[in-house]
Amino acid sequence: MFKLLVLSCLLALALPSLAEVGWWKTGQFYQIYPRSFKDSDGDGVGDLIGITQQLPYLKEIGITATWLSPIFTSPMADFGYDVADLKGIDPIFGTMEDFEALLARAKELDIKIILDFVPNHTSDECDWFIRSAAGEEEYKDFYVWHTGKVVNGIRQPPTNWVSVFRGSMWTWNEQRQAYYLHQFHAKQPDLNYRNPKVVEAMKDVLRFWLRKGAYGFRIDAVPHVYEIPADADGNWPDEPRNEAVSDPEDYTYLQHIYTTDQPETLELVYAFRDVIEEIDAELGGDDRVLLTEAYSPLEVLMQYYGNGTHLGSQIPFNFELLAKISYSSDAYHYSELIHNWLDNMPEGQVANWVFGNHDQSRIGSRLGADRIDACNMIILGLPGVSVTYQGEEMGMTDVWISWEDTVDPQACQSNEQEFERLTRDPVRTPFQWSDEVNAGFSNASVTWLPVASNYKLVNVKKERGIALSHLNVYKQLRALRDEPTLKQGDVSVTAIGPNVLAFKRSLAGYKSYITLININDDVESINLDSVFTSITTQLQYVVVNDKSVRRKNDLTFANSVLLLPKEAVVLSTV
């Protein structure tokens, strides 16, 4: 006997005809964190030549495009997100010639290269900032400056605004005799997008890399780009308190109503998309794309797609699953979050699915190692774009790093009691290629972050040889995405009670595919005839994980599918 509770709302999402589907609309995107992917020169830090050497691996796992975290010239205060030369390659990663060789090899393998673009700020070592601090007329207003306010004879920052990296958003510059704004690190001064020259300068940076051969950009930290306009006297209001937080240095101490998600932000995204369209017209070939990072309310995110008049980001990252799913989430929660995106997405747009990135705890650590395959089934089985962070395909997990060895500035600016809550180092450790020294990442005596202690058990070489390893399950799921049903079929998503997430992909004239995920530790018996319509009496197992006693091509009756604890499978009609 079993309970069958079906979420009432099933979604039938009509997708465009196959002829209308561009390369990215059903693409597999893969994030590379260059410092940690592959070290070719033995300095303990990954580089462009290392990435080029390993591009065949991306081809092996079916990747369509890879976006690289920043590779530009930087003093590395925030590991490349503090850019000093927006048109240069940092020597730690290689040379412009190395980048061009990477582009050429990627083209041979039909893999698109996407670059990380950081619009909110530059490094304080950027020539623009140096000139702005010196008061040069051309660059005087490239950044956000204010002389502050004097209280009881003491000069203070102009507002109470708190940085993402703790402490005041304002730092005093002796040369300029003024405070400059930095929403992040003090070495990351914010650009002033209310100056049209800044907008044009950044659009020119986009053009430069697109003409080099990049196929688009992942745009970093978009909600922070604009602050509320200053009043007639050039001043801004303080932000209100968040009464739930007592630490005045912590970013969450304030409600950031004046420093995030300002309406002009969307207009800037649309302007960046205009550049994409301009270069598409100039160079031709496959479409170039924008991916935007914003942990913003859903109603704001949907506007990133465009407003009916202007085109926006083709791929505004969907962080519903990444940010809101927890270890204790039930199937209803998974289904609700999937529906949140699909039900609110503007007509004609493309969904995307993300479970990991370089800022968030890895799937296996956050949700449990026995849910890794399930999460990959979700991102690779639902319609639209899948996004995988390096190592998630083989089940890499977070690495504990001591306070003494922590290098992430977000954590280093805290203290020994707080750093573990803030550090991103555990998800950025070297990629695990093999059971050789340093997991095959580097032959250096010391790597920039320590290698995971489990690398001899979890690595590409070992998992290639295990039939139901995370890597091989991922590759099977990826191969299945080439089926017409998964490229252009409808989708229905539901929870079958609290433990089982189910979704069906269907297309007239082709097999239907049903994904079943047992999130918890109960044995479940499912009558799919009462869940989905138009399925055959018997179903065939197409993909199984290592919790299953079934094997590929086994048959089962639709009215009595047995799911073991944490089992995740894909079935097809026969």
Curated annotation (Swiss-Prot):
Q: Where is the signal peptide?
A: 1-19
EC assignment: 3.2.1.20
Q: Which Gene3D superfamilies match?
A: Glycosidases (3.20.20.80), Oligo-1,6-glucosidase, Domain 2 (3.90.400.10)
Q: Where is this site: Transition state stabilizer?
A: D359
Per the record, the domain of life is: Eukaryota
Name the family the entry cites.
Belongs to the glycosyl hydrolase 13 family.
Q: What enzyme class is recorded for this protein?
A: hydrolase
Species of origin: Drosophila melanogaster
Active-site residues from the entry: D220 (nucleophile), E293 (proton donor)
Q: Name one GO biological process term.
A: carbohydrate metabolic process
The reaction(s) catalysed by this protein are: Hydrolysis of terminal, non-reducing (1->4)-linked alpha-D-glucose residues with release of alpha-D-glucose
Q: Which Pfam families match?
A: Alpha-amylase
Does the record's keyword annotation contain Hydrolase? yes
Which protein is depicted? Maltase A3
The Swiss-Prot or TrEMBL record annotates one GO molecular function as: alpha-1,4-glucosidase activity
Q: Which UniProt keywords apply?
A: Glycoprotein, Glycosidase, Hydrolase, Signal
Query: Which CDD domains does this chain map to?
Result: AmyAc_maltase
Give me the glycosylation sites of this protein.
N120, N307, N443
Q: Output the PANTHER family linked to this UniProt entry.
A: ALPHA-AMYLASE FAMILY MEMBER, MALTASE A2-RELATED
Please tell me whether the keyword Signal is annotated for this protein.
yes
